[in-house]
Structures are given as structure tokens and as C-alpha cells.
Amino acid sequence: MARFMGPRFKLARHLGVNVFGHPKALNRGVKQHKLSEYGEQLLEKQKLRAYYGVLEKQFKKIVFNALKSKEKSEDILVQSLERRLDNLVYRLGFGSTLREARQMVSHGHILVNGQKVDIPSYKVNIGDEVSLRSKSRKIQTYASNFTTIIPAVTYIEKDTESFSGRLIRLPKSVEVPVMVKYSKVLEFYSKN
């Protein structure tokens, strides 16, 4: 699967938000300029895409599915993005960054309900057990990440002894620690 290979810090400065989680990403100045309504919508969309590492084609499908649903579109959008396997691996603390978590999944270090899954965009269902492969538990980085990083969200359950975690329930848009105006993202795509 393709992913963004350009300059990450430059993108973070352009967006005005540290979407990659690296402490030095915003060390240089961020240019302040007044944006039009369209510009604000585009910027919010780009922030959300950059944070989750999703390319435009896949992101567009996720947003259109959220817009079609009868439930609250913001919550459906967040649930679709948060249920991705690479994101759940990051939220559980297996990887220190979303990019590291994505690499762990694609290299086959992660099991879902005891089966190896190497697709980062795999949708995890409620109650599915996400665990680290027994061979991968010997890798010091993964073991230390999992034991030291505490999940900041309430919709996942973490078991440090068995190196696993579960998605307990679907998240609401207000619970997710991503500073994005979801309504602007949905407005951007509802015009097209």
C-alpha cells in the first residue's frame, strides 16, 4: 500500500500542527495567514489525512461512506479511521508513532484473534483481540513501547501480561485525541 514519502516536518509546518508526533516537527516558525472558507476546509482535511497516513482515494471512500450513513457522520468518520489496524496498534502502544505501527503490521508482527494480519487498513471489530506475535515479543523496542506507553483513550482495553488489547466499543468524535474540526472535513466533501 502506498504512503506519504515526502518531507514530514515541512508538511507539519504547513498544516500548523504536529501530526507526526515528533517533538522537533514545529521547531521552525509557522507562517500565519488568513484563509478562505474553502482553505480552512482543505486544511482540516489535509490535517486528518496526514495524521492517519491515509491517501486521498481511500480517505474519500471513508468520508463518502460516513456521509451516506444515517447516523452522525462525524462519529462514523472517526470510527472508520480509528478501527484501522495500524491505528489501533498505535493506540495500544505497540508502536511509538503511527508510522512505526503501520510498519509493524505490514511486516507481520501483529495478530488479530490469533491470525496474522499484514494489512494496515484492516477494520478491527468490537471484541477482536489484537496481539503481538510471540517471536516479536523478544524485540526490545516493541516490548518496551507496549509496557511504557499508556493508552490515552477509553474505548480500548490493554493487557500488558499477554501483550494484547481489545476494542471494547466504537469511539465518539469527542473522545479521539486528534485536534481536527470534523465538520469542516465533511463540508469539504459534501460540496463535491
Curated annotation (Swiss-Prot):
GO CC annotation, single: small ribosomal subunit
One GO molecular-function entry: structural constituent of ribosome
One GO process term, biological-process aspect: translation
UniProt keyword list: Ribonucleoprotein, Ribosomal protein, RNA-binding, rRNA-binding
Name of the gene this protein is made from: rpsD2
Alphabetized PANTHER family for the sequence: 30S 40S RIBOSOMAL PROTEIN, SMALL RIBOSOMAL SUBUNIT PROTEIN US4M
Domain of life according to the entry: Bacteria
Listed NCBIfam families: PRK05327.1 (NF003717), rpsD_bact (TIGR01017)
InterPro entries: Ribosomal_uS4, Ribosomal_uS4_bac-type, Ribosomal_uS4_CS, Ribosomal_uS4_N, S4_RNA-bd, S4_RNA-bd_sf
SUBUNIT field: Part of the 30S ribosomal subunit. Contacts protein S5. The interaction surface between S4 and S5 is involved in control of translational fidelity.
UniProt function note: One of the primary rRNA binding proteins, it binds directly to 16S rRNA where it nucleates assembly of the body of the 30S subunit.
A Pfam family reported for this protein in Swiss-Prot or TrEMBL: S4
Protein name, UniProt field: Small ribosomal subunit protein uS4B
Entry's family note: Belongs to the universal ribosomal protein uS4 family.
Span of domain S4 RNA-binding: 83-145
